[in-house]
Amino acid sequence: MACRSCVVGFSSLSSCEVTPVGSPRPGTSGWDSCRAPGPGFSSRSLTGCWSAGTISKVTVNPGLLVPLDVKLDPAVQQLKNQEKEEMKALNDKFASLIGKVQALEQRNQLLETRWSFLQGQDSAIFDLGHLYEEYQGRLQEELRKVSQERGQLEANLLQVLEKVEEFRIRYEDEISKRTDMEFTFVQLKKDLDAECLHRTELETKLKSLESFVELMKTIYEQELKDLAAQVKDVSVTVGMDSRCHIDLSGIVEEVKAQYDAVAARSLEEAEAYSRSQLEEQAARSAEYGSSLQSSRSEIADLNVRIQKLRSQILSVKSHCLKLEENIKTAEEQGELAFQDAKTKLAQLEAALQQAKQDMARQLRKYQELMNVKLALDIEIATYRKLVEGEEGRMDSPSATVVSAVQSRCKTAASRSGLSKAPSRKKKGSKGPVIKITEMSEKYFSQESEVSE
């Protein structure tokens, strides 16, 4: 009988096959089974191999037909199969990780080259912060100047508004004075018209009185003439007393003198009254004329001043409009400059923040790559130890032919112990390998998320 062991996984004893010496193995002929005798075969079996005519009876120990109780749990065998599958998956993953590590090492070398190249360059070329600070300082200086100019323009505007208010008050006063003067002028014109009418009436009365005086003179003269004619033509016989002498001519002369005195007095009184009225009207007319002339001159002066004030008001209004337009333009320009500076500052801050984030991301990637590299180095060292142990185990003989049942059982037990030892080693090494693999999977999942 010969015992052949099959090593599965880490040289674990999975089955034991017992075949007769004379019977051929599966897939071989009977003559192929008779080769160099090994230790443990009897002389009878040896002669049977060489003599085809006599085949000795094979005696089998019944104890060998009893299944060998190796005290192996099926769960342990299932666990070993599972470990074998995991080992295959880990080997595949290890191969992919090696490729990724090589790619990452190339990328790391490229990044280190770029980093050293960037560090070797002149920092002033890429140092845009100083330029941005200078530009921001200039913008702030311009903003400060615009604010000062705005304050000055506002002060000038207040002064101009005060002057405009003062001119408006003066203009309103002049308008009120002009209205008063116009009203006074109208009143004076009415008085002048009334005085002219009154003067005309007085002149008419004077003329009527003069004509009346002339008429009275004429009447008196005519009456005197008539009376003289009557006295001359009438012959009167008067018995006179010689004792009483009457002087009629003296009486007539006296009456005539009285009439003449009355007429002269009436004429003088009328002339004096007319003269006084004329002088009074002339004085009043001269007074009214002088006041009218002064009013006209004042009105002309007021018109000139009003025209000047209007022109000044128009110029002040145009100046105010120009100042308001300048203020509005300055405000718009200042607002645009401020918004532009604000936008550029925000862009610079965003660019700086993005650069910081990129730098932090590169540092994190570099750190993660270093961690992955360290983990892969540990994993490679672990796999190297496992491979070296496996190679050392595979260099030792894998099958032994025993001559006795007791020695074969001991050999099988020793082999089972040897197979358990690498299994325990594998179990002990399973933890860090799986942990490192999980770390690698976690890193590559993070890398795929970052790339997306």
UniProtKB/Swiss-Prot annotation:
Residues 228-251 are annotated as: Linker 12. Residues 391-452 are annotated as: Tail. The modification Phosphoserine is found at S45, S396. One of its GO terms (cellular component) is intermediate filament. Residues 82-118 are annotated as: Coil 1A. Weakly expressed in tongue, but not skin or in any other tissues or organs examined. Transmembrane segments: none annotated. Residues 136-227 are annotated as: Coil 1B. It holds the Pfam family Filament. Residues 1-82 are annotated as: Head. Gene3D superfamilies: 1.20.5.170, Single helix bin, Vasodilator-stimulated phosphoprotein. One of its GO terms (biological process) is keratinization. Heterotetramer of two type I and two type II keratins. This is Keratin, type II cytoskeletal 80. It comes from Homo sapiens (Human). The gene is KRT80.
